[in-house]
């Protein structure tokens, strides 16, 4: 595998496999642990956060102070600023995302998409998936 820090500018993504960025960061952390030098929980968290520097460096919208993720997490052990990355790598998952504000707009409210027809979107996605699979 080499060393994970050979590519410090590599960010995380889901590549269409799933939409869970927390899971992607955790996978990165565990896979990097197999490589020479490993990766700390803080380094895995910083990789996830690197997208903000990329967005700001390219003057793209998003990544500003008007974005917020609110987690609902009942920690079985004390949660501090120092051990937050460890909780992030070992305990958090998408179920903990309670609300998300993106560019000042509430887009997830109490774990559900806000301001959109979730059932309609899922039905449309299902229809398009059937069309795609028919072509494959």
Q: Can you name each region flagged by the protein language model?
A:
Residues 1-73, 92:
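His/Asp/Glu-enriched, well-ordered alpha-helical/loop segment
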Residues 44-136:
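Active-site microenvironment of metallo-dependent hydrolases
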């Amino acid at each position: 595998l080499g060393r994970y820090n050979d590519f410090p500018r590599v960010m995380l993504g889901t590549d269409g496999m799933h939409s869970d960025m927390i899971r992607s960061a955790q996978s990165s952390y565990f896979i990097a642990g197999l490589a020479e030098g490993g990766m700390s929980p803080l380094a895995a968290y910083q990789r996830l956060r690197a997208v903000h520097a990329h967005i700001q460096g390219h003057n793209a919208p998003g990544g500003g102070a008007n974005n917020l993720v609110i987690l609902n997490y009942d920690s079985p052990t004390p949660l501090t600023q120092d051990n937050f990355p460890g909780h992030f790598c070992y305990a958090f998952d998408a179920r903990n995302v309670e609300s998300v504000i993106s560019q000042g707009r509430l887009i997830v409210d109490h774990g559900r998409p806000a301001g959109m027809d979730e059932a309609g979107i899922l039905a449309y996605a299902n229809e398009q998936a059937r069309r795609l699979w028919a072509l494959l």
